[in-house]
């Protein structure tokens, strides 16, 4: 649900 370098459903990946 996100993209690199953040690859996982975590707050740092959320829009």
Curated annotation (Swiss-Prot):
Coiled coil: none annotated. Belongs to the conotoxin M superfamily. Expressed by the venom duct. Disulfide bonds join 1-13, 2-9, 6-12. It comes from Conus betulinus. One of its GO terms (cellular component) is extracellular region. It is found in: Secreted. It comes from the Eukaryota. The cysteine framework is III (CC-C-C-CC). This is BtIIIB. The lineage of its organism: Eukaryota, Metazoa, Spiralia, Lophotrochozoa, Mollusca. The keyword Cell division does not apply. Keywords: Disulfide bond, Neurotoxin, Secreted, Toxin. The keyword Ligase does not apply.
